[in-house]
């Protein structure tokens, strides 16, 4: 029997968007109600997806600016990134293209990205928006638009609190590494027609 493939999966995104809760929810099937650490301890587990066993290594990062110099150290050897934003934070949504994509393209060019919208349970919670009048929900269509803009392999909305789509996020990350999307041929055609004499 062959050894399972190791996949390094790194979470990135603004502080307080729910990266650590997503990892805790996935690895323990529970939602942390009291203390949530800034960074989850690295975790690895054997996971079976579509009949293939992989050893999934999960790396958490801190989104706060204090960690800007340290964070890229965890990018080395990454097979896939989970780029998270909160579905109730327009700023975290905007920072995906303003801050995170430039950082990932600089330190880890070519590594596939799964775009993840977190806190799905709160987007439909009317009371949350009454209590937080400045909060602006991000729609599924806006998430899909952002996925296309940044060239992410997939876009998934999830809730760590209700566990909705949590497994789907990590399954998508594993699948994009095991079965990379085929490169589109459009680029080659465009390059052929761009000869300037």
Swiss-Prot record:
Keywords: Cytoplasm, GTP-binding, Lipoprotein, Membrane, Methylation, Nucleotide-binding, Prenylation. The keyword Lipoprotein applies. It is found in: Cytoplasm; Membrane. It is a peripheral membrane protein. The modification Cysteine methyl ester is found at residue 194. InterPro entries: P-loop_NTPase, Small_GTP-bd, Small_GTPase, Small_GTPase_Rho. GO terms for molecular function: GDP binding; GTP binding; GTPase activity; protein kinase binding. It holds the Pfam family Ras. A lipid is attached at residue 194 (S-geranylgeranyl cysteine). One of its GO terms (biological process) is positive gravitropism. GTP binds at residues 13-20, 60-64, 118-121. It comes from the Eukaryota. A motif (Effector region) lies at residues 35-43. GO terms for cellular component: cell projection; cytoplasmic vesicle; cytoskeleton; plasma membrane; site of polarized growth. Residues 195-197 form a propeptide. NCBIfam families: small_GTP (TIGR00231). Inactive GDP-bound Rho GTPases reside in the cytosol, are found in a complex with Rho GDP-dissociation inhibitors (Rho GDIs), and are released from the GDI protein in order to translocate to membranes upon activation. Belongs to the small GTPase superfamily. Rho family. This is Rac-like GTP-binding protein 5. It comes from Oryza sativa subsp. japonica. The gene is RAC5.
